[in-house]
Amino acid sequence: MWLTKLVLNPASRAARRDLANPYEMHRTLSKAVSRALEEGRERLLWRLEPARGLEPPVVLVQTLTEPDWSVLDEGYAQVFPPKPFHPALKPGQRLRFRLRANPAKRLAATGKRVALKTPAEKVAWLERRLEEGGFRLLEGERGPWVQILQDTFLEVRRKKDGEEAGKLLQVQAVLFEGRLEVVDPERALATLRRGVGPGKALGLGLLSVAP
């Protein structure tokens, strides 16, 4: 895997367009690994990091193949050199994590996906997803060692053929941060590669871990 940090230029018209629409952002970032995507060798994940005062927006991108960022428009972003990321996970290893995800449930009657409402429901969703993916949340004195740093709704327009404006969608985006433990290294690595939950094209699902 490869990790790239992009510092977007707010003066760039293309960057402003992408910041206003996650689908456009995903389309732009996909250009850096377009051939691998076409050949089915790629799984692009990305996350817009929390804003820090007046600092320019930062996007973290994870790819399975080495990206070519020369495809970006001139002045779009400051691109830090891609770094290879090959974590040697071990059972019992404890790590810090960050994840922006869409915690939701599917209604049995209609099959419609709806957002979870309470913090407890969202943390329980996270616990289940991590356990399915070879991790477990660490426990603190007051429960799972996790914080919800942001809880917002992304507003995006998804156009279908023949539509001019497209349908306005609201997608819940929750930023989790905390500590976890590796239970099954093989499943855990697969989880890092494929991401967690729905909404990958909206900048959701990238699970970042560090010692």
Curated annotation (Swiss-Prot):
The record's section on SMART domains has: CRISPR_assoc
- Write the record's keywords in alphabetical order, separated by commas: Antiviral defense, Endonuclease, Hydrolase, Nuclease, Plasmid, RNA-binding
Q: Tell me the GO BP annotations in alphabetical order.
A: defense response to virus
* Membrane-crossing residue ranges in chain numbering: none
UniProt similarity note: Belongs to the CRISPR-associated protein Cas6/Cse3/CasE family. Subtype I-E/Ecoli subfamily.
Q: What is this protein called?
A: CRISPR-associated endoribonuclease Cse3
Function in brief:
CRISPR (clustered regularly interspaced short palindromic repeat), is an adaptive immune system that provides protection against mobile genetic elements (viruses, transposable elements and conjugative plasmids). CRISPR clusters contain sequences complementary to antecedent mobile elements and target invading nucleic acids. CRISPR clusters are transcribed and processed into CRISPR RNA (crRNA). This enzyme processes pre-crRNA into individual crRNA units, but may not actually undergo enzyme turnover, retaining the crRNA product. Generates a 2',3'-cyclic phosphodiester.
Task: Give the EC number.
Answer: 3.1.-.-
Domain of life, per lineage = Bacteria
